[in-house]
Amino acid sequence: MSIKLSAGALASLPANIAVPKYRRSDLSAGIIHFGVGNFHRAHQAVYLDDLFNSGAGHDWAVIGAGVRAADELVREKLGEQDWLTTVAEQEATSTKARVIGSMIDFIPPGDAAATLDALARPEIRIVSLTITEGGYYISPATQTFDSAHPDIVFDSRNIDAPKTVFGLIVAGLARRRKAGLAPFTVMSCDNIPGNGHVTENAVAGLAELVDPELAAWIRRDVAFPNSMVDRITPATTDRERRMLHDSFGLDDNWPVFCEEFRQWVLEDKFPPGRPALEKVGVTFTSDVAPWEWMKIRILNGGHASIAYPAALLDIHFVHEAMQDAQISAFLEILTKVEIIPTVPPPPGVDLDSYRDLIARRFANPKIGDTIERLCFGGADRQPKFILPVAADRLKSGARVQGLALVSALWCRYCHGETESGKTIAPNDPIWERIHAAARRARQDPGAFLEMRDIFGALADDPIYVAAFSEALLSLWARGVRPTLGKYLSDHGVAA
């Protein structure tokens, strides 16, 4: 017999499920979080839960918020269980379950008035974001704020009823400024290099369109700390719900399954105050950049490197890709030869050891992370995780054969079928465009590089163009395995 998760059921849960040690009625809100997806609930919410369990920080509970239609479903499902979430931490030989209680409310998505009222509350001192890499209105090629985007233009003309996260933040800050309240800190927790700077440019950039004086105040008085976040967290499916039911006798509308490993490095820049997260393992520093580059280039770049060859070979799970000798060897050589040389090591970190840790995490068979998830949104992810590494290599006169091959594999994937002929379902917000470019590129590889908002100056670099073209033509003429084999043999590895 199973138990349905709710606040009233906590005392009845089996002993092998950890529950909050604090009284949730003692919590009060200090944070509004936009984007209450799986990653937030497996990461920031867990760290806060740890802090609350220690007896500290009870005035830093989370209120959820969102602007997408999908956020309403999350609110509905979490509301049915009193905003509680079950987090199942999985290693190869064990699974541990715990109930997280750090969120205490969720503003109805689409209710701009209620959201703005909440943002104006003096006790709200942090607004945090996990809105995905593609949610920041940044031009992929220039990495600058896209002030001409229709959503941004709309908000600039309707700032009292905005429809974007940034419109709500700007309007909320304007209210606080008018009321003489200190501004809240805006904390991005997305996988973007310099995510604090990117967020500041989006918020201040929109404010500039509304009120230049407000924009100047934001740039002067609002803090946007940079951060590095890390925890592999797959999407939730019925598979995970069944596993929780079968293994723990608990029914959760939207549980989160993740790896045991987690890491959070934060720039210590919170003028209105912050929770004492250093007590529960968060690293605070004055310079997050080395940690960001390490994680984004080695882990996220590694994900991109195995995703597309695995997808084209009909491999479903990430751990299965790591069991493929050729794909795992490609990841190892590419990371050692082309990626790590572009990464300045954080203090006290050995990058080769970090790479080995990443490989072990990818190989965890319990996680159930899918290749489809890693392939999603390549048009946003390639310009953040792969193309800048290639650009840095070219600036130093180094070779980019492996990095160009990763992007060629993405192009081949975007053509829309695997090597066995199976159809690849659209898997990118701009799928129609990249699919059309990939089809043209089968005969003319340069046609894919013509998407200059993605490839930027690389599209005009003859060395990169030649490497990309050679890789793509080989993928079509010879196939994935011979092309990977050629790269490996060029580096002395038997394929």
Model-derived features with residue positions:
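Substrate/ligand-engaging "lid" and interaction regions
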Residues: 1-495
